[in-house]
């Protein structure tokens, strides 16, 4: 896909016999653009824009990349279920984002929740997934650095 463009893909949609491949390709092109914009947002310390892009990326992973569940067993959709439950919580509090993270089919979700709602979210989501499966994390002001 690095050797073509979204416009070229769209010009040939009717010739491609794999709708899923088209959807996943659209994700690839859009995600590449999002990553560039996210890097710019971080460079400008525009964390609101970064979180917006992270949210868009997560929705695209779910809808277009389709890496939140395994096609072999469509009845088991743990990641989409936890994303939907988390989104209900976030809608209720009026803030935060969630997305699939990591391995996709066998991945986890990442939820960015306002600090003052963290304990409430942990309690809420634990009733569905078990407290042992919820890992609250902090975001450091400085990421990984090389010392020496």
Predicted segments, located by residue:
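C-terminal nucleotide
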Residues: 1-99, 111-148
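N-terminal pre-core extensions flanking Radical SAM catalytic domains
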Residues: 103-109
């Amino acid at each position: 896909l690095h050797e073509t463009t979204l416009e070229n893909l769209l010009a040939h949609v009717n010739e491609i016999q794999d709708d899923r491949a088209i959807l996943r390709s659209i994700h690839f092109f859009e995600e590449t653009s999002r990553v560039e914009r996210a890097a710019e947002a971080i460079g400008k310390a525009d964390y609101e824009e970064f979180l917006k892009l992270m949210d868009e990326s997560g929705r695209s992973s779910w809808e277009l990349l389709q890496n939140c569940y395994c096609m072999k067993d469509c009845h088991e959709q743990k990641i989409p279920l936890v994303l939907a439950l988390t989104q209900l919580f976030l809608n209720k509090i009026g803030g935060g984002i969630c997305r699939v993270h990591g391995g996709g089919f066998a991945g986890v979700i990442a939820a960015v929740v306002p600090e003052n709602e963290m304990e409430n979210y942990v309690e809420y989501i634990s009733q569905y997934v078990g407290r042992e499966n919820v890992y609250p994390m902090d975001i450091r002001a400085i990421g990984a650095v090389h010392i020496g």
